[in-house]
Each structure stands twice: as C-alpha cells, then as structure tokens.
C-alpha cells in the first residue's frame, strides 16, 4: 500500500477557502486521514489558522505568490507551484491535491493505488478542445490555433486534435513526478497570455500528461463539493459561524463537532436561490 500525503493549497483574504480546507481535513480525518500511511500538508499564506491541526504547513510568502501567479496575472499558478513544493518536501509515495471546496465521500485509498508512473488522477474529462461547443474551450482554440510554444530546451507545443480539458479539482501523482508539474507550470506560463479563460492551469496539466504518455483517470465519483455559486453562498457562512463559535485552532473540539455542519442545502434554500437568480 502506497503512503500518501493529502495536500491542500489555500491563500487569500477570503476565510471561506481556509475554512473549506479545515472542513476537508475534519470530515476525512477519523475515517481516512489518520491512517499510518497518510499525512496532510497545507500550503497557505495564513499558517496561524492551522495551528493545532495534524498537518505540516508550508508558508506562502508574498514573493512566492507573486512569482507563481505570474505577477498577479492568474492565481491558479500558485496551486501548481504549491503542489510542486509539497511534492519536493514530502517522504510519501503519492501526493493527492484537493481544491478547498471538495471533500471525500468515499475512501480515497483505491484511487491512490491507481497512481503510478503512467497514470495520474484528475477530477473528470471535460472533452476535446478543437470543435467543442463549450464556450470556454473555444477560447483555447481561438487563442492557440496555429501557434507554437517553446517547451523545455528542445520541445515545442501546439494545440492538437487530441488536446483535452481535464478538471483539476483533484490531482493525484507520484511524489517524485516533480518534472511533470514543473512542465505543467512552464506550459501554463506560456499559454496564460494567449487564452482568455481561467482554466489554463488544468489544461496545462492535461496536456503535459498527454505529451508525456501518461493516462488520466477520473476521481469525481469519490468526491462531493460545494463549488457552485449557490452552494458557496450557503456553506461559507455556515463554516464561518462554526469557527467563530469554536475558535480557529482547537482541532479536538472541531473534530468532536464537525459532523453538525450541514453542507447540503435544504430544499427550501435551494428553491429560494433559484427563484432569486431568475428574478435578478
């Protein structure tokens, strides 16, 4: 059985992202994260918020955030470089990154065992780029078609008929595959200036793995999320109230009470949100 480090990258002024990271840890800890072969790493610019939590913390400086976001052009570069940093400093066999608005509904161990030199885990396949009806995908075709980009010292990249978009809400790799993530960040740094979309980071991971002959498996069936706007508007104040009540750093108290947090929206709330959206 592989050892695994569960990685969360969270930063910025919005507490909801940090609270989401904590909820992710709390909801999985007693079931899966406290196993002898499991560790947790949080890459954050707010290390004090994770004091007392059973994780190692890598502290993001302003300089790192600026460089990794291409001087503020696109913050998702911080996610890639944060993952790379965690991979470079872990002794676990595999590194498994989740976005802060995701949480496990099934044991992640079977997913971890599928990770190898030729297989990584991503959230889901969102389809090919060329000829897509997806408006966001079209921006890649518009921005990249008939262009070549330098990749490394002796490679070139160009959009191909096999180019696909894979979501990176989850990203599972062997911890020694640092070059894969480095390549993804290099491609991200080149493409970001040419594509008017916020998904260049995950596209870059998808493309580098394809070029490298590495297959991608979907991990979506193992996860639940609160990533939609409606869910975020419901969950964020609930988490804020929880940590206001119990404090930010009392892990044992959080662990004893986290299951009182109701992530799923009541039907009445969902209905009100839909009506409000239609009227706005």
List each language-model region with its residue ranges:
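Short, charged, surface-exposed secondary-structure boundary motifs
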Residues: 65-73, 129-136
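Long, low-complexity C-terminal extensions of enzymes
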Residues: 233-280
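A short, conserved beta-to-alpha structural element at the edge of catalytic cores
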Residues: 122-147, 264
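N-terminal anchoring/stem segment of glycosyltransferases
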Residues: 1-69, 88-91, 267-280
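A conditional alpha-helix N-cap/helix-loop micro-motif detector
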Residues: 21, 73-76, 198
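GT-A fold catalytic core of metal-dependent nucleotide-sugar glycosyltransferases
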Residues: 80-134
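Glycine-rich, basic loop-to-helix element that forms the pyrophosphate-binding segment
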Residues: 68, 77-82
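Catalytic core and acceptor-binding pocket of nucleotide-sugar-dependent glycosyltransferases
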Residues: 151-241
């Amino acid at each position: 059985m592989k050892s695994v480090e569960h990685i969360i990258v969270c930063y910025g002024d919005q507490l909801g992202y940090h609270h989401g990271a904590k909820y992710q840890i709390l909801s999985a800890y007693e079931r899966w994260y406290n196993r002898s072969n499991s560790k947790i790493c949080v890459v954050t610019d707010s290390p004090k918020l994770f004091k007392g939590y059973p994780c190692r913390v890598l502290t993001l400086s302003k300089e790192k955030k600026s460089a990794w976001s291409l001087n503020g052009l696109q913050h998702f570069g911080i996610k890639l470089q944060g993952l790379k940093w965690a991979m470079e400093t872990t002794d676990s066999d595999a590194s498994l990154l989740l976005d802060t608005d995701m949480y496990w509904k099934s044991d992640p161990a079977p997913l971890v065992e599928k990770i190898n030199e030729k297989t990584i885990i991503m959230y889901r396949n969102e389809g090919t780029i060329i000829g897509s009806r997806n408006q966001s995908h079209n921006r890649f075709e518009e921005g990249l078609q008939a262009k070549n980009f330098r990749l490394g010292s002796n490679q070139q990249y160009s959009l191909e008929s096999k180019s696909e978009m894979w979501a990176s809400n989850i990203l599972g790799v062997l911890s020694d595959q640092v070059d894969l993530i480095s390549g993804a960040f290099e491609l991200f740094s080149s493409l970001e200036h040419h594509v008017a979309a916020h998904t260049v980071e995950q596209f870059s991971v998808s493309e580098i793995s394809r070029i490298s002959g590495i297959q991608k498996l979907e991990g979506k069936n193992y996860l639940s999320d609160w990533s939609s706007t409606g869910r975020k508007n419901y969950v964020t104040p609930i988490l804020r109230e929880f940590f206001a009540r119990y404090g930010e750093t009392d892990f044992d108290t959080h662990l004893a009470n986290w299951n009182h947090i109701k992530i799923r929206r009541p039907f009445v709330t969902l209905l009100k949100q839909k009506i409000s959206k239609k009227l706005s």
